[in-house]
Amino acid sequence: SKDLAALVERFKEAGMPISYEHLGEPLPNDANLQLTIYRIAQEALTNVLRYAPTTKRITVRLARRVGCAELWVINAAAPGSPSMHKGLIGMRERAAVYSGSVQAGPVDGNWQVYAILRWQEDTLEELKWQLPV
């Protein structure tokens, strides 16, 4: 989403080594869904800034799939940085509104926040981008 890209750009302008990748089609035209994803990413990035300010790399990845969106915020774990569980409850509450979940923890030497949010996609119009040509 363009709001998420703008959020990443603001962190980049603040000097953070951050990149953004959007996979798949744009998100549904649902302002609440888009805001939920934005807020989860914002909280995860704020935690990186607070607890791992010396990280060498941050990746924000958003993937649109049929009936769901997946969000990853991954940072190279800074040596000795404390666990970043602050704000996790709020992120989980936001995701739960969309039958989703949030997980956070170390993955392959990095710290990863992963969120999945779900919605019903059952009309031909909503699914046409997934149908073979």
Positions of PLM-derived features:
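Conserved short strand/loop->alpha-helix "switch" segment adjacent to the catalytic nucleotide/phosphoryl-transfer site
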Residues: 20-41
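Flexible, glycine-/charge-rich segments associated with ATP-binding catalytic modules
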Residues: 94-133
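Glycine-rich nucleotide-binding loop
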Residues: 67-70, 77-79, 107-114
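Conserved phosphate/oxyanion-binding catalytic-loop motifs
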Residues: 44, 91
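Glycine-rich/acidic phosphate-handling loop/turn and adjacent ATP-lid/helix
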Residues: 71-89
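Short beta-to-alpha transition helix within the HATPase_c
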Residues: 1-16
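Short beta-strand/loop element within the Bergerat-fold HATPase_c
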Residues: 57-67, 72-75
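Short helix-loop "hinge" at the ATP-lid/N-box region of the Bergerat-fold HATPase_c
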Residues: 48-49
